[in-house]
Amino acid sequence: MAMLLYADSKFTSPYVMSVFVALTEKKLPFKIQTVDLDIGANNDPDYALISLTQRVPTLIDGNFALSESSAIVEYLDEAFPDPPMFPSDRQRRARARQVQAWLRSDFLPIRLERPTPTIFYQRPVSTPLSAAAQAASRKLCAGASELLGHGGDNLCGDWSIADVDLALMLNRLIVNGDQVPLALVRYAKAQWERPSVQGWVRRERLPL
Ligand SMILES: N[C@@H](CCC(=O)N[C@@H](CS)C(=O)NCC(=O)O)C(=O)O
């Protein structure tokens, strides 16, 4: 039976994107059910019965419902190991998970001032970054440059889902014309060309 992915109706959630990419990479059959976050449909009692967090993404696999994007991707990776979403080497895998957790728990000023509709609806903003967002941007670029200092195409050797998450965060800055080192721009661009990522980027979207 096809799995069901609950997604935001405008397809701008970076967390839904991460799960979409994992399902697509693994060529798993799945359907998408949209939830209109603009009207708070995620707080409807019916959705709360399905989604413990009342957020998207939530994945339904048979009678099992799971929220939190990184938990979903790890679940998929254990249930359907091929192709893997994380490096096989333990320390590289830990690094990929660290990056995922870091991107989800930090960089709030960037997320607020450079929201994902600026990427997926190609509507860059002209407001300069606040001092807090500039500091977050410096931290992000320093960390990403350090992680990619090996000169390879991916964060942790082989491609992993953390590359998608990092490219998304960098693109928040890049598409809005904020300063990002050229090596990171090239990295984000290459990651963005991945067919599974393009499958999300090119989705038909409702008007903003
Ligand atoms: N940590 C969660 C974050 C999920 C999240 O923040 N989803 C947003 C959309 S991007 C949402 O559902 N917002 C609605 C709300 O919180 O009311 C994950 O990784 O899945």
Spans of features found by a protein language model:
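Conserved beta-strand edge residues that scaffold enzyme active sites
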Residues: L37-D38, Y187, R205-L206
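Residue-level signal for well-ordered alpha-helical positions
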Residues: A79, V99, N176, R203-E204
